[in-house]
């Protein structure tokens, strides 16, 4: 496969390491050839790097299979998930899910990602999650919905910019793509 075909979420093998594509953009500088600018994450270490590749550069795509699972809890070193069909439990080291951790709520359904060899390499989050506002500033009289918003700390520690009318204790829908506010949980039907 060529680098130009890589899309977000795909995993390829580079120098014996599994690399996940976080973002991929075509870029045509004023002079010169088109290049691919990508944000890549080492699946095992969690390290994220920005890399520029030629569109024709060859990559070795890794086949990934998915299994439905439920997030149960975490301990000092791992996140624990349960296969919803077999009830088998899987442990993933916390450092491997650094960016996903802030969206993990007990009982949330995720997809576990496995290589063809059966190696667990990560998770796919749902597109949105329901979270509760743990801490935010009180509503300001006269604030409008068109205002810039205010920071709110969710029950996982994630900080989200929310409209001024949001209060502590409210349940919100949060996008997992970039941690943005989607709406109140009671006003959005999924």
Curated annotation (Swiss-Prot):
**Molecular function GO labels:** translation elongation factor activity
Major location (coarse): cytoplasm
Under InterPro entries, the record lists: Elong-fact-P_C (IPR015365), NA-bd_OB-fold (IPR012340), Rib_uL2_dom2 (IPR014722), Transl_elong_fac_P/YeiP (IPR020599), Transl_elong_KOW-like (IPR013185), Transl_elong_P/YeiP_cen (IPR001059), Transl_elong_P/YeiP_CS (IPR013852), Transl_elongation_fac_P (IPR011768)
The name of this protein is Elongation factor P 1
Q: What is a biological process (GO) this protein takes part in? A: peptide biosynthetic process
Enumerate the Pfam families for this protein: EFP, EFP_N, Elong-fact-P_C
Any one Gene Ontology cellular component term annotated for this protein: cytoplasm
List keywords of the entry alphabetically. Answer: Cytoplasm, Elongation factor, Protein biosynthesis
Q: In which pathway does it act?
A: Protein biosynthesis; polypeptide chain elongation
Explain the purpose of this protein.
Involved in peptide bond synthesis. Stimulates efficient translation and peptide-bond synthesis on native or reconstituted 70S ribosomes in vitro. Probably functions indirectly by altering the affinity of the ribosome for aminoacyl-tRNA, thus increasing their reactivity as acceptors for peptidyl transferase.
What family is this? Belongs to the elongation factor P family.
**What compartments host this protein?**
Cytoplasm
Q: Which organism is it from?
A: Lactobacillus johnsonii (strain CNCM I-12250 / La1 / NCC 533)
Gene that produces this protein: efp1
> Can you tell me which residues the record assigns to a coiled coil?
none
């Amino acid at each position: 496969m060529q680098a130009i075909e890589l899309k977000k979420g795909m995993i390829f093998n580079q120098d014996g390491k599994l690399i996940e594509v976080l973002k991929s953009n075509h870029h045509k500088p004023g002079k010169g050839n088109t290049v691919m600018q990508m944000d890549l994450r080492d699946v095992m270490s969690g390290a994220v790097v920005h890399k520029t590749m030629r569109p024709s550069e060859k990559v070795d795509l890794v086949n990934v299979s998915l299994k439905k699972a439920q997030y149960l809890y975490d301990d000092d070193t791992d996140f624990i998930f349960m296969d919803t069909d077999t009830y088998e439990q899987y442990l993933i080291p916390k450092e491997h899910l650094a960016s996903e951790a802030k969206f993990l709520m007990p009982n949330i359904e995720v997809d576990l990602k496995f290589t063809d060899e059966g190696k667990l390499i990560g998770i796919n989050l749902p597109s949105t999650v329901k979270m509760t506002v743990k801490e935010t500033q009180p509503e300001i009289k006269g604030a409008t919905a068109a205002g810039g918003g205010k920071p709110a700390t969710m029950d996982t520690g994630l900080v989200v910019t929310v409209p001024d009318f949001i209060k502590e204790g409210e349940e919100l829908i949060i996008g997992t793509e970039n941690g943005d506010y989607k709406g109140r949980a009671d006003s959005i039907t999924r």
